[in-house]
Amino acid sequence: MKNFFQQMVASFFGTLAAIVVLLSLGATGLVLLFILVSAEADPVLEEKTALILDLAIPIQDTSPTLSLQQSLLGNQEEILPLRTVVNAIEKAAEDDRIVALLIDGRRSNQVDGYANLSEVQQALIKFKQSGKKIVAYGLNYSELGYYLAATADTILINPMGGVEINGLGAQPIFFTGALAKAGIGVQTLRVGSYKGAVEPYTRENLSPENRQQQQLLLNQIWQIYLTSVANNRSLTVPQLQAIASDQGLLFADIALREKLVDKVTYWDEVLAELKQAGVWINDPEKIEEQEEDKEFRKISLAEYHRLQNWETENHDQDPKIAIVYLEGSIVNGRGTWENIGGDRYGELLRTIRQDDDIKAVVLRINSPGGSASAADIIWREVELLQAQKPVIISMGNVAASGGYWIATAGEKIVAQPNTVTGSIGVFSILFNVENLGDRLGLNWDEVATGELANVGSSIKPKTELELAIFQRSVDQVYEIFLDKVGRARNLSPTALDSVAQGRVWTGLAAQKVGLVDQLGGLQTAVNLAAAQAELGEQWQVKEYPTPRGLNSLLWNNLIHGLTETNSVVLPPFLRTNWQQLEREWAELAQFNDPQGIYARLPFSWHFLNP
């Protein structure tokens, strides 16, 4: 019998080892296949070329992490990292082979995030100041797409097209009635009269304070938009506001009359504009000048960025500035590649602190906040990092609440005028299923050694004593938050109280009240980090977290399977509302703080393109 078990165990481990070997060989084969399929030829750039900024490609801080299926099949959504876009445009301004830039809005306008687009806009203005022409052409310009197109020397539009200038709006969703119908009870605790993050679960509309701050914030971001567009188009803010109030969506001929565009035309005349700007155009009548499959010489931003990397001399020995991207909700534990896990980022920052080649760090925060515990774990690692090397905070579209908590550990804070930040406040949401149990005929009994033994249970609502305990915890976390902000920003208790209470600020307003040091984008923060570290002109940037390699994707999917959930296909008029509902529930699912206390933005805005 003993030999039987020994043989069985040996057979089991032998089989397991064989499976591991086969999987390894299979994974290696897939890697080699992927490399062969995805290999690209060395890029080539000819004279008289136009750089293309495609408004159909979203611009985000970092490229998304792909699934194995997306990596192998190449069906991933195309996304441009912000630094890729800005660096490519700025380098193209100095490259004699690039003679013009085309802002292409023919497909759709998917660009998003006013703060990120402000940095792209500044790069476009520098390109134009170099003496090179920018031409914009589109079918339908969204408000965000037009924000970039307005920088062009010439804006052209298809005769069937239009321009959207109708202002900013938000339509928050409230779950209170739905939760009540489902039998789910909600009890909330918060500190800060403006901390409205609990309102979707307790109210059926916005509180006066939350409505006031959202209205003020929208107005400020809108004024920044109007001022920028007015300056670029030689219009006035009152003119644009009148267009937004009275017309909103302008057909091509009306947009021309209102001087939002310069010409209503078709694609062939766009080619004529590019030719006038010096771009080589394929002429069918001149056989000697024809180039196969080319209307004109062009290169995309992604291709040009790859070309620059290929042509640039390797400087591996230069001191490094690390850019650490913190994007998404802040969650307890390691999290996923779509959010900011406190433990995972804590480890990453420790690794960077111990790397002697890294002389300075930029934390790029694009987060509405989340778990207070996770934010504090990251804050501590930033504090330790700052003690050894300069840490500059760069705020993206939003860096609020838990995102601002982390930012207080940096040496300097840089934000765009239209960044959403602040929201210094905390809250807790306590759900219970007592009514749901009644409806389903479920009953619970209780045995305990004391009145507070089952304080963590969600079976029934919290008692007054239990609520008092939770409120004490919320108050304590808020005091910790205030202390960090007060010490970091050198604010008196009175000044601190006036900027806290969960109130949200634009970057421009935040600078005025002392929450932000300097206005600018990611490159501003990088340059500041280099100056603080006294690196001179010779340094290089290294970005974190590094993308997952294909091997990691392969093993993960060999274990969990290659299947992906198919999304529901909905008509356009339902899709927006369904996506909003999905986002809200997905964000609620990330509420995993061990104490149930959160430092998070009190609303979730998504400015959608038509």
From Swiss-Prot:
Any GO MF annotation of the entry: serine-type peptidase activity
Gene3D superfamilies: 2-enoyl-CoA Hydratase, Chain A, domain 1 (3.90.226.10), 6.20.330.10
Membrane-spanning segments: 17-37
One GO BP annotation of this record: signal peptide processing
Major localization class: membrane
Residue ranges that the UniProt entry lists as topological domain Periplasmic: 38-610
UniProt protein name: Protease 4
